[in-house]
């Protein structure tokens, strides 16, 4: 068993740097890593237009009810309260990123988006980079998994932005099982960029999206979610990729209508938290266990420290198999 020394005194901002030496050579695919769902949604611009991915019914709802509709949408679209710096300082190392252009934007600016628009992408990436510069042994996963209204030019712009901001901090795509903290530290790499677009095949530092699978339960029922999470882990491929367990409940339209004024956090997340956290506590990382675990409102229920502490109690033999 890995040593439990220090696990009760976690330095969350530097938790990777302070892992026991025995874990430095373990593939990152076999560690437990906390992440956030819709990581950028702590800021949603109610003055912005509705995102282009939203169905016509939502577009019409907003066109009729305007700002009131957007305020209600925000209660259900905002899945985080901490900004990137806050999440990083609290221990989050995986970021779920969705990128969009704005209709008729002459500047062709790129924004984070989930229903409504969030901050400019370059601002968020710079914020993450500032943390990495101050914490040179911490490693982040940037998962660009949805693109809305983006043409070839926009992808080229985003790729150049990543180069300009992160430069040599980015780890080129290799076999996932070769990536350990030791490997990354030796080469001064701190950023793994996953890109769910064919563009990834053309750029050495973009990891193909299929190397970061994230099965989605799409349910409001905590019991069904836990069954789904357990089944997904059981089916996890033995080698070859990272793996995300989304400990996330997804509201149905009827759920939103019933709790329209209270929002996602109060209506769903907080009520289901005990059951979801109990599942997390019983997991272990390793080839046939969890890897990256994501959640809404990551500050709730000691989620982050609970995931990190799993690294101190798992069977080292299995992790190195």
From Swiss-Prot:
Localization per Swiss-Prot or TrEMBL: Cytoplasm
Keyword Lipid metabolism part of the UniProt annotation: yes
GO biological process per UniProt: lipid catabolic process; signal transduction
PANTHER family per the UniProt record, alphabetical: PI-PLC X DOMAIN-CONTAINING PROTEIN 3, PTHR13593
Active site (UniProt): 37, 114
InterPro entries xrefs: PI-PLC_domain, PLC-like_Pdiesterase_TIM-brl, PLCXD1/2/3, PLipase_C_PInositol-sp_X_dom
One Gene Ontology CC term in the entry: cytoplasm
Gene3D superfamilies reported for this sequence: Phosphatidylinositol (PI) phosphodiesterase
Protein name: PI-PLC X domain-containing protein 3
Domain PI-PLC X-box intervals: 22-197
Keywords: Cytoplasm, Hydrolase, Lipid degradation, Lipid metabolism, Transducer
Summary of the tissues where the protein is detected: Expressed at highest levels in heart. Also detected in kidney, lung, small intestine and colon. Expressed at very low levels, if any, in leukocytes, thymus and skeletal muscle.
Any single Pfam family the record assigns to this protein: PI-PLC-X
SMART domains: PLCXc
Main location class: cytoplasm
